[in-house]
Amino acid sequence: VNMSWGYGTTFTNITGGNYRGTSWTATSRQTQYGMIGTYTLSGYRFVVRNTSVDTDVQEMIDAGIHICVAAGNSYQKIDVPTGLDYDNYFTKTGSGNLYYHRGGSPFDDEALVVGNIDSAVHSGGLEQKASSSENGPGVDIYAPGTNIMSTVSNTNRFDEGDYPPNTSFKICNIGGTSMASPQVCGVGALLLQANPHSTPAQLKSHLIASCQTNGIYSTGLDNDYTDTRSLKGSNNRFLVNPFSSEYKFRIQN
C-alpha cells in the first residue's frame, strides 16, 4: 500500500499541545517536540490517521492479505501505542487533539511498515536513513528507496525520460518510501513462493528475521529531532534477500 505523503493537515492556527505528558501553550510549530513535517505552500504539513482507511487495511489483513505500507516522507517519527510519544498532540483553532507521532493512513500495526534507506552511506560506513523518511519504533524495516529507476506516467511532476526499448513508456529516477516498500514486497513474494500458506503475521516475522541488524546509522536517542538521519528509537533492520547466495535462511512455521 503506497501513499507516501498520507492523509494530512498543516501546523497552522496552533493553540497549544502536550508532549510526553506535559502541556504547552504556543501558536507555532514546536520542533523541539518533534513537530517536523514537510513544507508546503500552505505551511508545514504532517500526516494523520483516517479511521475508515485503517479499518479497511485491518480487514484485509484479517482476510489473509499481506500488506506492506510505505512509512511516509514527512520526516516524522512514528511511535507504537506503548511509546512515550504516541500520545503527543497539538490543538489548533476549530479542531480537537491532533496526534502527530502516530503515522499516516493507510496504517496498521500488523502491516509491515517500510522506511527508506539513502543511496549514500553514512560517514562511518554504515547505511543511513534517507532524511525525509518516517522513522521511530513504528517502522519495521528499512530498504533501499533512493535513486530508484521506475516507470512513471507521461504527465506528472517528475522529470521523466524515454524507456529506450519503447519510447512511448517513460522512466524516472525516484526516491521515497514508495520506492523502498516494493523492495520488501519482492522479497516477501519470494518467501511466499517458498511457503504459500504463511499468514500475514508469519510473513512479517520471516521478513524481520531475515534482516541485517544494527547496520544503519543511529544516535541511540529517541528524541534527537534535529538529526534527520536519526532512527529515533526505530528498529535497526535493513532488508536482506534470504535467498541470496551470501545468506542462509530456513523458513519454519
Predicted regions and their residues:
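Extracellular/periplasmic catalytic domains that process cell-envelope and extracellular macromolecules
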Residues: 59-63, 104-108, 132-135, 142-143, ...
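Extracytoplasmic/secreted envelope proteins and their assembly/folding machinery
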Residues: 54-57, 64, 111-114, 129, ...
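Short clusters of hydrophobic/aromatic residues that line enzyme substrate/ligand-binding pockets
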Residues: 129-132, 148, 216, 239
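Active-site-proximal beta-strand/loop segments in catalytic clefts of secreted hydrolases
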Residues: 3-7, 70-74, 114-119, 135-136, ...
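C-terminal subdomain of the subtilisin-like protease fold in secreted/lumenal serine endopeptidases
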Residues: 1-5, 63, 111-113, 193-253
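Hydrolase catalytic cores
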Residues: 6, 145-225
